[in-house]
């Protein structure tokens, strides 16, 4: 019996028709999953050949053998409430982080997205480390990229605009917008207290451009889609404050009103050209339920 669908809640059973090694057999039978994913399944102890648990990648299969992959085999799962792996291959991760955790820290004792991924890599016997490619603020949720080695991270950094061609956010803001769409541009610069200030004129800071499009208006709030030409620190929060529609739950650049119990900002879309395989990869997550208005 061959399973046509990769479903981690079902037991998968396959009959061996021709000689093969166990690792490539799993990759073929499970809808062409990556080598890394197949290794993770084997390492987890979920694979049985003729009733015997097998973790050996090159275990030799012969015709008429039965390969069984147990229920709840864990594919790309980390043991953390903060992070979910959306995509993984031998070069990089795409992850979705919750609001409330930082991406990385110089203090190794801090729990960060990076430290959680490094624990996952170690547990799954992958000899590499997670390298930060870009960041989201602690209180912003959404999609993030991490590389598995410095060379891949450097390829993103050297060709960021050409490689990562579409990043979009959704924001819940105070006020009912009337304008359907627009562009905000200014120079952004931090003061000594690390508060970012915006200026229409060059203030020695960095030029930033944010495009916005209204999604919905309801009862004193607006839901807005945002696309960035630049990725400056606090760019979206400062720019939305500039036009009089501060992000909900923002104590720094808004009034701090906590209607939804968090900052109303989520990175929902990420599209890029894989720097190694040249695949065009597109990822999108649902808007947080708390953003419903």
Predicted region positions:
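RNA pseudouridine synthases
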Residues: 2-293
């Amino acid at each position: 019996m061959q399973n046509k669908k990769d479903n981690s809640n079902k037991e998968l059973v396959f009959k061996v028709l021709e000689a093969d090694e166990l690792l490539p057999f799993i990759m073929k039978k499970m809808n062409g999953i990556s080598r890394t994913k197949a290794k993770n399944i084997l390492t987890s102890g979920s694979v049985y050949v003729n009733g015997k648990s097998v973790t050996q990648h090159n275990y030799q299969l012969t015709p008429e053998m039965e390969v069984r992959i147990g229920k709840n085999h864990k594919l790309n799962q980390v043991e953390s409430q903060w992070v979910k792996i959306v995509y993984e291959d031998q070069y990089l991760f795409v992850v979705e982080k919750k609001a409330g955790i930082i991406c990385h820290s110089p203090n190794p004792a801090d729990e960060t997205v990076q430290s959680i991924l490094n624990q996952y890599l170690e547990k799954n016997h992958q000899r590499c480390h997670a390298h930060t490619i870009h960041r989201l603020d602690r209180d912003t949720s959404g999609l993030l990229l991490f590389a598995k080695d410095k060379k891949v991270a450097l390829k993103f950094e050297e060709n960021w605009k050409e490689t990562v061609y579409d990043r979009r956010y959704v924001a819940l803001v105070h006020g009912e917008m009337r304008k359907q769409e627009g562009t905000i541009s200014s120079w952004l610069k931090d003061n000594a207290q690390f508060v970012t200030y915006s200026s229409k004129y060059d203030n020695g800071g960095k030029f930033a451009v944010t495009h916005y499009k209204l999604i919905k208006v309801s009862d004193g709030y607006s839901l807005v889609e945002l696309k960035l030409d630049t990725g400056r620190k606090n760019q979206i929060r400062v720019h939305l404050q500039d036009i009089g529609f501060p992000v909900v739950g923002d104590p720094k650049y808004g009034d701090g009103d906590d209607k939804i119990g968090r900052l109303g900002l989520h990175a929902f879309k990420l599209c890029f050209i894989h720097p190694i395989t040249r695949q065009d990869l597109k990822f999108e997550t649902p808007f947080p339920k708390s953003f419903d208005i």
